[in-house]
Amino acid sequence: MQSYWTEFGALTLAHLLAVASPGPDFAMVLRQSLAHGRRTAIWTSLGIGTGILLHVSYSLLGIGLVLQGSPTAFTVLKYAGAMYLAWVGVQTLRSARPRAAGPEVVAEKTAPEPSTRAAWTTGFLTNALNPKATLFFVALFPVVVNPATPRSVQVGYGLWMALATAAWFSLVSVVFTQPATRRAFLRWSHWIDRALGVVFLGFAAGLALATLR
């Protein structure tokens, strides 16, 4: 039992460090928070957490090893992810325009608010179409988790990481949708949208150029 807690602690630390690092998931939650508000951002965060479950499932079922050993599968997935991030980047750049900065700006909808399903799907696709995330778990589990650890325990690890991811990005959503914080950001929203659009395009280019190591 003690070894399980050791594994759990190591997995948690490595995963939280990875989740807290700026990346496409963080950029997407920031975009959703500023453009659409808390509800949309939190549902996007839940979609990202669900994406983690997909990557963990790949690792537990051995599909991740197939991806790791198949340049063709890796290439197909990375280009799908790159095209999605590029599309998001272009949409973000197109939405960049000056907006009013008065107190009413927080309540004003600057764009049609996505449905719950659309917000969740956005988060899920942002995470699920990133093959680097799958390779992260494929590399992490064999190093940290003993092969003798029961599959049920490993599933528990995966569920925890999905919940922790959703909780982290939900917290980010709450922080960036505080009225004072959101007002401050919205004063410069057209510049932030432009910057985020460029960031998404940069992530798309980086993913498209990624190689198996």
Predicted features along the sequence, with ranges:
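Hydrophobic alpha-helical transmembrane segments in multi-pass integral membrane proteins
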Residues: 58-60, 129, 134-138, 200-213
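Alpha-helical membrane-protein architecture signal
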Residues: 5, 9, 13, 113-125
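Hydrophobic/aromatic residues within the transmembrane alpha-helices of Major Facilitator Superfamily
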Residues: 16, 20, 53-54, 90, ...
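Selective transmembrane alpha-helices of multi-pass membrane proteins
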Residues: 68-102, 160, 164-172, 183-213
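Alpha-helical transmembrane segments and their lipid-water interface positions
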Residues: 25, 51, 55-63, 85-88, ...
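Membrane helix-loop-helix hairpins that form the core translocation module of multi-pass transporters
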Residues: 39-119, 205
